[in-house]
Amino acid sequence: MPKGDGKLVAQNKKARHDYAIEETFEAGIVLQGTEIKSVRNARVNLKDSYARIDKGEIFLHNMHISPYEQGNRYNHDPLRTRKLLLHKKQISRLIGETKESGYSIVPLKMYIKDGYAKVLIGVARGKKKYDKRQDLKQKEAKRDIERAFKERQQ
């Protein structure tokens, strides 16, 4: 999570709805040329993205970074596979956790921290339909309670 002066660039709200997040990790991301300029302009979409482990390295797939407007021919493929930067211990831990069936790695947030682009990834287990319904009911009940409490104070 961004501590202090981390500027939030993109957030994957759908991930918290579709998955139960077990654990989170902060990872750096390898970007090329004009991609960082698009990231700083918050032209990023994490909606359908996911991370995969390949030969001891973690790669982020299907993350859309829009081409930079003034980048002309130097722009890169918007859906290019990007490498995530983590410590070896963290990678081995992620490998162990994702070997269990039902677990996957999803990006939750992207932000700029101390001038570097960071991605908050989470080890997640998919929610069933009834879990999603239950979460929505709890959220709605909490909202109703807060609304009633606010009306009493006025």
Curated annotation (Swiss-Prot):
Highest taxon listed in the record's lineage: Bacteria
Biased composition (Basic and acidic residues): 132-154
GO cellular component: cytosol
Pfam families for this protein: SmpB
Gene3D superfamilies reported for this sequence: 2.40.280.10
Compartments in which it is found: Cytoplasm
GO MF entries: RNA binding
SUPFAM superfamilies membership: Small protein B (SmpB) (SSF74982)
Chain positions covered by the region annotation Disordered: 131-154
GO annotation, biological process: trans-translation
Predominant localisation class: cytoplasm
Function field: Required for rescue of stalled ribosomes mediated by trans-translation. Binds to transfer-messenger RNA (tmRNA), required for stable association of tmRNA with ribosomes. tmRNA and SmpB together mimic tRNA shape, replacing the anticodon stem-loop with SmpB. tmRNA is encoded by the ssrA gene; the 2 termini fold to resemble tRNA(Ala) and it encodes a 'tag peptide', a short internal open reading frame. During trans-translation Ala-aminoacylated tmRNA acts like a tRNA, entering the A-site of stalled ribosomes, displacing the stalled mRNA.
Family: Belongs to the SmpB family.
UniProt-recorded name of the protein: SsrA-binding protein
Organism, scientific name: Listeria monocytogenes serovar 1/2a (strain ATCC BAA-679 / EGD-e)
